[in-house]
């Protein structure tokens, strides 16, 4: 579930207006899969900008398996608010315009940040903190993936 406007709501309004439909979606998808004898699949919630502690805690309680993080949230805060959820993100997508050094430095920092707090490697999916914008050079995106492989490998110290 990709909600790019979640951060436009106050934490109270996010809980009142956004969470009920988000919970309905996750519950309905799981029910449909079960009714049709289909295997459960991991469901991801990306609520861009919903970074207040109360919003993070509420998002963690929705039932989604993975929480996607934008680049403005501190992963440790999400880990504390939703300790039983895997995390995805959260490199600033604008780094892809900064050249190879900026991309590599950002990925190295992202990997180090997600390793803080003893988060298990399987509990994090390296990704951007939002979508890829149209002007990104495919070679820079390829470099992002290469850096992710380099710095997220087990045993590599960023």
Predicted regions and their residues:
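Active-site loop segments of alpha/beta catalytic cores
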Residues: 1-158
């Amino acid at each position: 579930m990709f909600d790019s406007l979640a951060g436009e709501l106050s934490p109270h309004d996010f809980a009142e207006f956004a969470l009920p439909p988000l919970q309905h979606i996750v519950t309905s998808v799981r029910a449909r899969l079960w009714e049709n004898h289909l295997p459960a699949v991991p469901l991801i919630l990306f609520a861009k900008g919903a970074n207040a502690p109360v919003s993070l805690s509420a998002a963690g309680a929705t039932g989604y398996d993975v929480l996607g993080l934008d680049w403005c949230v501190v992963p440790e805060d999400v880990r504390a608010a939703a300790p039983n959820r895997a995390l995805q993100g959260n490199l600033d997508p604008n780094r892809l315009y900064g050249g190879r050094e900026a991309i590599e430095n950002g990925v190295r920092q992202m990997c180090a940040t997600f390793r803080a707090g003893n988060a298990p490697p399987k509990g994090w999916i390296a990704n951007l903190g939002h979508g890829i914008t149209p002007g990104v050079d495919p070679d820079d995106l390829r470099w992002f993936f290469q850096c992710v492989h380099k710095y997220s490998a087990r045993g590599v110290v960023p």
